Amino acid sequence: MAVEYHLTIKEMAAELRPRERLAAHGVQSLSDAELLAILLRSGTVTTTAIDLANQILSRFGGLRGLAEAGIEELQAVKGVGPAKSAEVRAAFELGRRAACRPGEWQPTVRTPEEAAGLVMEEMRYFDREHFWALVLNTKNRVLAVEKVSVGTLNSSSVHPRELFKNAIRRSAAALILVHNHPSGDPAPSPQDIELTQRLFEAGEIVGIKVLDHIIIGDNKFTSLKLEGLF
């Protein structure tokens, strides 16, 4: 009978264990698999938590796929039961909520990088186009993130009336438009450029400035303002 030996995490050298590495070097020093292993806490009889984490990431194609995996899909992986699957789903949901709760601290947005950073971790994983607006006051503080519409895989429909009705209700001074491209490529389409120009002109009429339109891709973005497209 063949015998295969596996080190448990407790049997690893202390400097190689994920929790110890996090404490010594900070959370950003850990790989995706190591972070996931901390959530999983244990593996199976034949695999460590890190091995199991690598299997999960491989099965779902990395973090992006894992973020969209449901409870039943996670439990289809050997070694992942109700507790582990719930912990993974809860961790991703907390990350998404933290990434898009501006009303709790009202950040100031002065650059395209700051605007994109506010919504990136939530919008980059959507499998349909979502159109949002960052609603700003006169000091560029975010009053709200308005979720204006949900479209299809490659398009979204936005009516100026709906966009500016909510902005006026919140006494907005300006807006930053944001939407995602599920393909991961943030390059603007001709329709994106046309819509931006139309909404910019509508904003001029009602007295609410459209400062930018940010297109979110897979951990990258395009600012139509920086590109000189409106």
Curated annotation (Swiss-Prot):
Keywords: Hydrolase, Metal-binding, Metalloprotease, Protease, Zinc. InterPro entries: MPN, RadC_JAB, RuvA_2-like, UPF0758, UPF0758_CS, UPF0758_N. SUPFAM superfamilies: JAB1/MPN domain, RuvA domain 2-like. PROSITE patterns: MPN (PS50249), UPF0758 (PS01302). GO terms for biological process: proteolysis. It holds the Pfam family UPF0758_N. Zn(2+) binds at H179, H181, D192. A motif (JAMM motif) lies at residues 179-192. The keyword GTP-binding does not apply. Residues 108-230 form the MPN domain. GO terms for molecular function: metal ion binding; metallopeptidase activity. Belongs to the UPF0758 family. This is UPF0758 protein Daud_1467. It comes from Desulforudis audaxviator (strain MP104C). The lineage of its organism: Bacteria, Bacillati, Bacillota, Clostridia, Thermoanaerobacterales.
